[in-house]
Amino acid sequence: MIASSIKAEVVKANARAANDTGSPEVQVALLTARINELTPHFKTHAKDHHGRRGLLRMVSRRRKLLDYLKAKDADRYTALIAKLGLRK
């Protein structure tokens, strides 16, 4: 689980407006933070299949949000990808 202070920083860094918590950019950034936090856990606990299912669900949800953002506004999509460092 992400600490609320880290979550607030992520929201502030990616928000489009003052109280924006629901835009695709914020949602993708929060999912990315959670995924990055869980990744080391699976390097040490390779057999945690139940947890891996949750991780894959988060990755899938992030992918769907990114696909939506790419279809709606490609400029925002490319800016977000560059900011989060998701694509090589």
Curated annotation (Swiss-Prot):
Q: Which GO terms describe its molecular function?
A: rRNA binding; structural constituent of ribosome
Provide this UniProt record's keywords sorted from A to Z: Ribonucleoprotein, Ribosomal protein, RNA-binding, rRNA-binding
The cross-references to PROSITE patterns, in alphabetical order and at most eight, read: RIBOSOMAL_S15 (PS00362)
Under the heading SMART domains, the entry gives: Ribosomal_S15
- Spell out the SUPFAM superfamilies in the cross-references: S15/NS1 RNA-binding domain
One GO cellular component, as annotated: cytosolic small ribosomal subunit
Extract one GO BP annotation from the record.
Answer: translation
For this protein, the record's InterPro entries field holds: Ribosomal_uS15, Ribosomal_uS15_bac-type, uS15_NS1_RNA-bd_sf
KW Nucleus (keyword) present: no
- What domain of life does the native source organism fall in? Bacteria
User: Its quaternary structure?
Assistant: Part of the 30S ribosomal subunit. Forms a bridge to the 50S subunit in the 70S ribosome, contacting the 23S rRNA.
PANTHER family listed in its UniProt record: RIBOSOMAL PROTEIN S15, BACTERIAL AND ORGANELLAR (PTHR23321), SMALL RIBOSOMAL SUBUNIT PROTEIN US15M (PTHR23321:SF26)
Function noted in UniProt: One of the primary rRNA binding proteins, it binds directly to 16S rRNA where it helps nucleate assembly of the platform of the 30S subunit by binding and bridging several RNA helices of the 16S rRNA. Forms an intersubunit bridge (bridge B4) with the 23S rRNA of the 50S subunit in the ribosome.
Assigned protein family: Belongs to the universal ribosomal protein uS15 family.
- Give the protein's recorded name: Small ribosomal subunit protein uS15
Species in which this protein is naturally found: Verminephrobacter eiseniae (strain EF01-2)
